[in-house]
Each structure stands twice: as C-alpha cells, then as structure tokens.
A protein has these predicted regions:
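Flexible "arm" and connector segments at domain edges
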Residues: 1-61, 65-95
Length: 95
C-alpha cells in the first residue's frame, strides 16, 4: 500500500538524513512546526471541500495525510497501529 511505502521513506529520512529533503527539514524544525503544518493542511482540506473543487480537495487531503505520516514517524506510531485502530472501530460498528 502506498501509505506504507511513503511511511518507510519518511522513516528512512529520520534515520539517515538527506540534505535537501523536505522531510528532514520539517523534522529539524521541531514538533511545533510540524503540528502547525498539519493544522494548516487540515484547514486547506476544509477550504477546498467547501469550494467544491474535487481535484484540489484530493491534493489537500494527500498533503494532510503526508504530514500526518511524518508526525506518526516522529511519535513512533506505525501505519499498522492506525490500521488496527480502524479495524477495531469498523468491527465494533458491525456487531
């Protein structure tokens, strides 16, 4: 799954920084900057969806998910952890 692939690249950048990498520069700026960026991206999703621009909404959701993956890597949360939470919630709702 592509989310796993992107997450793996992000983890690699954390472990072995690459000069000029956006992920590395974001991580170097600290958690507060990353959290601010996630807030900005979430707002951009809302604005795009409110405007009815499907393609822009997709792009903004992709940006939001990407930055959430960076946060997950920083916090030691794997994609598997999130998939498990989705599965738990989905299965709970099906009972």
């Amino acid at each position: 799954m592509i989310l796993d692939d992107v997450y793996t690249v992000i983890q690699g950048r954390r472990q072995t920084p690459v000069e000029g990498s956006y992920v590395c520069s974001l991580l170097a700026k600290g958690k507060d900057t990353l959290l601010k960026k996630i807030g900005e991206e979430a707002t951009e999703v809302v604005i795009a969806a409110k405007g009815g621009d499907r393609d822009q909404t997709i792009r903004e959701i992709t940006d939001l998910w990407f930055h959430c993956l960076v946060l997950m890597a920083e916090e030691g949360i794997s994609t598997g952890d999130v998939y498990q939470e989705f599965e738990t919630r989905f299965n709970k709702g099906r009972r």
